[in-house]
């Protein structure tokens, strides 16, 4: 049968070819291994023929860092007690490249470092103890001399990154000879308390009922303006009060609203707070009070911090700034 013969032939000739192919593969594998071994030997030989490795020098600087008196002061007052890296020399890698920035002046950095320690850090230490601050304080402070402006024209006062780092801008605007408490609060301390409160609520969240008080009124990134028949108008704090917000920025979102209550309360007098509530009107004041009750209870019950006591300490320390030598490093 021709067909069966063809099948036999096909079956006969195909099988030996498969065995032969397998053998070829084995041979090729061995040849490849020998080639790689030979290549490795050549490379190692070439390396041995190169100049000896210079172990006496490193591509990394091993020279001791030269510290000035301010650096030593920062070690004693920030680094050793709290493990804080206080960066007053602007580092490009630590800066936000979308802004045009300049470094902080040395004298301004010295003054602000003393003010921050006395008014902000030591206030929490006085009330809650040094261990509390050691655990929760951001480990990096970065000072920038110039303001940071968004494309919208808004000036960024400060930023925080994951509870690890706080950047303060516009340091060069600090007038050491004429201390302005309101300006210090606006530029620095409202920001410091604001960002620190973020760290705390990210560790232990606040009552979610807070989010529902002004639900539907948050405007996100549009917090800085509102629309009228004449067009967009800047939204100032007093514009936000009747809507139940302590600042215009509090209208961004609930988390910002929460921490703005803390920042504004502890940095301002009761007279300021009462005037704000009156200007807010009955509805606005009721909303602010409802929110602040949650804020106050959270700080007291969760962290053992009475905001009334913290405010007394902060306001007292603000008045003591004029008694501090802001220029001399001892």
Regions found by a protein language model. Give the residues of each.
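Acidic/polar, low-complexity intrinsically disordered N-terminal segments immediately downstream
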Residues: 47-128, 285-288, 292-330
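Post-HEXXH active-site segment of zinc metalloproteases
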Residues: 204-227
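Surface-exposed patches in mature extracellular/periplasmic domains of secreted proteins
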Residues: 124-141, 203-204, 208, 272-280, ...
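Active-site recognition of the HExxH zinc-binding catalytic motif
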Residues: 186-206
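Short pre-active-site segment immediately N-terminal to the catalytic Zn-binding motif
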Residues: 172-191
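Metalloprotease/metallohydrolase-associated module, dominated by Zn2+-dependent proteases
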Residues: 221-292, 321-326
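Sec-dependent bacterial lipoprotein signal peptides
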Residues: 1-10, 15-45
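Auxiliary, metal-adjacent structural segments of Zn-dependent hydrolase domains
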Residues: 110-165
């Amino acid at each position: 049968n021709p067909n069966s013969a063809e099948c036999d032939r096909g079956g006969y000739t195909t099988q030996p070819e498969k065995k032969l192919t397998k053998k070829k593969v084995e041979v090729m594998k061995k040849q490849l291994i020998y080639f790689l071994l030979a290549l490795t030997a050549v490379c190692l030989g070439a390396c041995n023929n190169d100049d000896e490795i210079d172990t006496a020098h490193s591509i990394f600087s091993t020279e001791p860092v030269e510290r000035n008196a301010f650096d030593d002061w920062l070690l004693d007052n920030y680094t050793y007690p709290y493990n804080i890296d206080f960066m007053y020399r602007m580092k490009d890698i630590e800066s936000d490249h979308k802004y045009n920035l300049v470094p902080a002046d040395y004298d301004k950095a010295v003054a602000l470092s003393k003010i921050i320690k006395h008014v902000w850090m030591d206030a929490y230490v006085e009330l809650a103890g040094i261990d509390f601050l050691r655990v929760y304080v951001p480990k990096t402070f970065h000072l920038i001399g110039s303001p940071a402006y968004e494309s919208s024209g808004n000036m960024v006062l400060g930023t925080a990154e994951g509870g690890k780092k706080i950047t303060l801008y516009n340091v060069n605007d600090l007038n050491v000879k004429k201390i302005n408490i309101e300006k210090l609060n606006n530029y620095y301390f409202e920001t410091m308390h604001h960002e620190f409160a973020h760290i705390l609520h990210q560790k232990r969240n606040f009552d979610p009922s807070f989010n529902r008080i002004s639900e539907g009124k948050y405007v996100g990134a549009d917090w800085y303006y509102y629309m009228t028949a004449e067009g967009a108008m800047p939204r100032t704090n007093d514009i936000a009060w009747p809507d139940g917000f302590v600042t215009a920025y509090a209208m961004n979102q609930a988390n910002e609203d929460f921490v703005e209550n803390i920042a504004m309360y502890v940095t301002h007098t009761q007279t300021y707070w009462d005037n704000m509530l009156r200007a807010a009107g009955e509805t606005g004041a009721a909303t602010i009070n409802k929110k602040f009750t949650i804020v106050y209870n959270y700080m007291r019950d969760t962290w053992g911090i009475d905001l009334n006591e913290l405010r007394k300490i902060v306001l007292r320390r603000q008045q003591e700034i004029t008694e501090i030598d802001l220029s001399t490093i001892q």
